[in-house]
From Swiss-Prot:
Residues 1-22 form the signal peptide. This is Photosystem II assembly lipoprotein Ycf48. The gene is ycf48. The lineage of its organism: Bacteria, Bacillati, Cyanobacteriota, Cyanophyceae, Nostocales. The keyword Calcium does not apply. It comes from Nostoc sp. (strain PCC 7120 / SAG 25.82 / UTEX 2576). GO terms for biological process: photosynthesis. A 7-bladed beta-propeller torus, about 55 by 55 Angstroms, with a depth of about 25 Angstroms and a central pore.
């Protein structure tokens, strides 16, 4: 009798588990607008940028990886720079017209004024707080650089001189993001808090996380901030009250993979990259979600999503994985008549 009751309990638990998994499954997208791009490397890729020519771009990553495309990102060729060590980690690349910048670790800054045909190294002070991990080209001879402890510097003379924008660093960060209008948000190394900064402020403003879940990544939405937390949670700040947060959403409950990065393609369409080949999309600003299951077999964690323009986007994964957005596939899917 005891054995029968035990089996009944086990059976009931299995049924409940199966029902929960079934109910939590995110619906599939009706089409897949992403194509896997073959790359001549298995290095960890970290950033992508294009020159004023939308066909001409660069990918950067670990082990001094620098790849160049001249056909919009369909094909990439490796470039070797004359550096004293091939173990540099190229963290960030940015272009404004023909002028471009690359920053990396340890303490590396590269500059080009001819669309990347030649690169020169600009020495950085030994007193620089931390290593540069982010660079943003802002115009001719103008760029803004940030380090892994939240120090922010700006040059207006092509990198000859740099002026500190914030008086004190914020501490080691795991992620740092800059908005189009020059605001910053940084997540602490352990994800226990985040900080914000904007021009005119002397120091970073710290903020406690709003739940017990550690913060994975943060960035800027159309009218505030977005936040990805451990356990697959996504959250948006309240447009009416930027200091408050809307209720957290968990697009897929029964999952062990995390959400790693998010980017807007349009004001309403947003994509999230996650671990184990997971890619989610919302077409209503984050209210409901669908999963692109056509890329689930890609053996990579999708840790960076980039949309340079609505019709030009990329998903960067580990082990040399790159997905390219196919606007024609999306256009065809949205114009096909219903069956």
């Amino acid at each position: 009798m005891v054995i029968v009751k035990s089996w009944q309990k086990i059976f009931t638990l299995l049924v409940v588990l199966l029902l929960c998994i079934g109910c939590s499954k995110v619906p599939s997208t009706s089409y897949n607008p992403w194509a896997v791009v073959s790359l001549p490397t298995e290095a960890k890729l970290l950033d992508i940028a294009f020159t004023e020519n939308p066909q001409h771009g660069f990918l950067v990553g670990s082990s001094a990886t620098l790849l160049e495309t001249n056909d919009g990102g369909n094909n990439w060729q490796p470039l070797n720079l004359a550096l004293d060590d091939d173990r540099y980690r190229f963290d960030s690349v940015s272009f404004a017209g023909k002028e471009g910048w690359i920053v990396g670790e340890p303490s590396l800054l590269l500059h080009t004024t001819d669309e990347g045909r030649s690169w020169s190294r600009i020495p950085l002070s030994e007193k620089l707080p931390g290593n540069p991990i982010a660079i943003q080209a802002l115009g001719t001879d103008i760029a803004e650089m940030a380090t892994d402890v939240g120090a922010i510097y700006k040059t207006t003379d092509g990198g000859k001189n740099w002026k500190a924008q914030v008086e004190a660093a914020v501490g080691v960060v795991r992620n740092l993001e800059r908005s189009v209008d020059g605001k910053y948000v940084a997540v602490s190394a352990k994800g226990s808090f985040y900080s914000t900064w904007e021009a005119g402020q002397n120091a970073w403003v710290p903020h406690n996380r709003n739940s017990s879940r550690r913060v994975e990544n943060m960035g800027f939405s159309q009218d505030g901030l977005w936040l990805l937390a451990r356990g697959g949670q996504v959250q948006f700040s309240d447009p009416a009250n930027p200091d408050e947060w809307l209720d957290a959403e968990t697009p897929e409950l029964a999952t062990s993979w995390g959400l790693l990065d998010m980017a807007y393609r349009t004001p309403n369409e947003v994509w999230i990259g996650g671990g184990s080949g997971n890619l989610l999309v919302s077409t209503d600003g984050g209210k409901t979600w669908e999963k692109d299951r056509d890329v689930e077999e890609v053996a990579a964690n999708f840790y960076k999503v980039v949309f340079l323009k609505p019709d030009q986007g990329f998903v960067i994964g580990d082990r040399g994985v790159l997905l390219k957005y196919q606007p024609e596939a999306a256009k065809t899917a949205t114009t096909e008549p219903a069956a």
